[in-house]
Amino acid sequence: MQLREWNARLHGLVVFRALLGDPVVAKLAALTDRLEAADDTIAPLCDAVAAFEAALFAHTTNLGDYLSNAVLETETFCVRQAAAGQLSPVMEAALNSELSFLQKLCGLTLDTLLEAADRQNRELAFLPRWEARQLDLTAAYNQRMREAGKKGYGMFAKHHVFTVENGQLVPVKYPDPQKLSELPGYEKEREKVIANTRALLAGSPANNVLLYGDAGTGKSSTVKAIANEYAADGLRLGEVKKNQLYQIPDLMDQLAANPLKFILFIDDLSFSSNDDNFAALKAILEGSVGGRARNIAVYATSNRRHLIKETLTDRTGDDIHEADTRQELMSLSARFGLTVTFQRPEKARFAAILEELAKQHHIQMPMEELLVKAEAFAIRAGGRSPRVAKQFIEQCESGVQK
């Protein structure tokens, strides 16, 4: 392939147009531009080669490895159409043509590129050579499209936990690594949430879920651990703040056609009687903002059974419809299809949690002594809870508790 063709095919990407915004691919395009300019000045060419290699070497020394990963993770309209079973013949032909070119590009070396440009590569002999290898990109990409329901595409292939910014999901690079195996106690409660999540992943009807209970009982940890546990099965978690509830309908529209399954997670949810966010959540749970997408469920945690902060002012106000208003607010929790209660642990459950955590953290202390000290610690910390148990065990591990 001549240099002009290399450059034209690279700049003429349509399906994989987004690759040109990749910093490494952009530097490669700048290098082919410099070579095609046929400028005999060596310094600008050295600069272009060095800039590309510096960008590539920050990730890997192998162009084929980098480019193949970038191709497989790029979100394209073809993969979206294929996931919906609507890939047209025109798009399929364009996809296969570009994959064939990108496969050749994976095997491109500096010497091959210089030869295509009819340049004397001895002038650049002092520069390092990147590695290259051709892969069967067409087969790999077709497999990725078939697995889109579990592995996803675009940012959803790289990350499984997200927050919301300006109405868009934004990846969390370092999510909480919480594991279900690290959460002793509350197995019956947790299994209800897990079963509902499995139904969501299977494409079966799944409920919106309210995890209610005392602070520190593991409600939020349960949701985060489930997201980690089932990420490989196609589950993604988007955390929505209470002041962002009005953005959920737009998020649902964005995600409805995605082959992955999504939990939109609202942590520590509660409302006051004049809270505008109440109406937004009510509309979402009732489905009055559009049909419920089968691949999305709303999970929320709250320390309040009815999700409402009641004050003396609320009860003695002059609103003629005060009772009806309060009843409507208190009935919001009933609109969740599944409510799971996490109660503060009694002494026996607290002891069982402590024993399991002590094993996980390799605490070498007689259990009787451990329980006595933990009970005293819990009294100072405001009462028994899994969070208090974990804090105590971590202090034992660090040597603070002896």
PLM segments and residue spans:
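AAA+ P-loop ATPase mechanoenzymes
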Residues: M1-P184
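Pre-Walker A (pre-P-loop) alpha-helix and adjacent loop at the N terminus of AAA/AAA+ ATPase modules
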Residues: P175-N208
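Short glycine-rich substrate-engagement loop in P-loop NTPases that contacts/grips substrate
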Residues: R190-I194, A231-P259, S273-A279
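Walker A/P-loop
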Residues: N208-G238, L251-A256
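Conserved AAA+ ATPase "SRH/arginine-finger" region at the nucleotide-binding site
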Residues: G238, D318-M330, G337-A351
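Conserved catalytic/switch belt of AAA+ P-loop NTPases
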Residues: A256-A257, S272-D319, D324
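Walker B catalytic acidic pair
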Residues: D267-L269
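C-terminal alpha-helical "lid" subdomain
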Residues: Q343-K402
